[in-house]
Amino acid sequence: SIRRQRQMCIRDRIYAPEGTGVNQYLESIDSYNQRAESPTTWKKQVYTGDDYLQKMLADHKGNVVVLAGNNQKKTRYIMESIKAGYHVLADKPLAINPQDFKLLTEAYQLAKEKNLLLYDLMTERYDILNIIEKELLHQTELFGDLQKGSPDNPSVIMESVHHFFKTVSGKPLIRPAWYYDVEQQGEGIADVTTHLIDLINWQCFPDETIHYQSDVTVNAAKHWPTPITLAEFSQSTQIDSFPAYLNRYIKNDVLEVMANGSLNYTVKGICIGMKVTWNYTPPTNGGDTFTSIKKGSKATLKIVQDEKNGFVKELYIQKEPDIDNRTFEAQLQKTVEQLQITYPFLSVKNKKNGTYLIDIPQEKRLGHEEHFSKVAKAFLHYVHNQDMPEWENENTLAKYYITTTAVEMAKKGNK
């Protein structure tokens, strides 16, 4: 984000409770400041008193607050920050239950009245695969029209598999203990689905406003737990015992984390299916996986990240069986040539059986760090120019209406 702009000294005023979260954050800043290539020059000013929120609000340093970490109080932090006159850039999720969602709607209304911006940190829009897929999605001569689908056969399907314990940049990823409490972290369908729903809104309904009261229906939602033993919990958190607040989730000495879920919903007549799975750790040489399918009348777009691809995301287009091979190939070539004007690195590889790889070289794919920088620049542009489109606000509310309604539906056992 801002801290990654070169040759700039950033005074980072950090307000947080003592614990793993703030320690990991400070270690990250140190690693950026000390790296060999393009080191940053952050100057840390840290406050870790119990009244960290009140201290931040009272100090009122600057005009932007970035909120991240424990999600249980995040919506309240958003509201208090807006009351205090801050623009807010918040890490997802902005709300994890219906009560949070109600407060979030009030926060957006207050921000509007005070000419302040509230922005959700959505990095996936800056992944080049998602950008190219969005372009292809609206090439009607190639893709056709996005199918409406049905609850039993959605036209858009997204599935992701994640892991609580894994190695990142050669180091084991240490989680704070509260990460295993769905009251603090949020259920799987309230958390990682935010990126997926945002992508669907952004790709399938570009520049369109989605009103959750009239354009959205949540059809079904389910959830189920991931079992975590004390040994696994200790390995992941470096804490020897389960904290008392997790006792209600423990059965036969095993922690049950309601991290998995599926939801089915409709936006403007398009039916969408989604599934999120959290395992404790990946298999040997394994990793996180992801599948996205969007069905058009002439072709289907797929993004796949799996073992076959070395856990690297790839974009494919597959023609419908009734579309002539030569006609489709000619249209695909024509479309790619048009896109190459803006994205000259694009190419196509025939993978047989009517499937084609839209090849994007690894060196043209920005890393996750650069995605954060892109979001920060977009947000700061909106702050400076006061020109954020209204669909950003409404579509974010629609997104959290979907997730929080799904959580409540899953709890009630609706299918």
What are these model-derived regions, one by one?
Residues 2-6, 10:
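Single conserved hydrophobic/aromatic residue that forms the stacking wall/gate
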Residues 11-18, 44-49, 65-68, 118-122, ...:
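Extended hydrophobic secondary-structure segments that form protein cores and membrane-embedded regions
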Residues 11-38:
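NAD(P)-binding Rossmann-fold cofactor-contacting core
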Residues 41-89, 93-110:
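Beta-loop-alpha module in the N-terminal Rossmann-like domain of NAD(P)-dependent dehydrogenases
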Residues 84-86, 113-116, 270-274:
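A short helix->loop->beta-strand "cap" motif at the edges of active sites that frequently abuts
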Residues 169-287:
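Rossmann-like dinucleotide-binding domain that binds NAD(P)(H)
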Residues 191, 196, 201, 213, ...:
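C-terminal helical cap and adjacent loop that interface with cofactors, partners, or active-site loops
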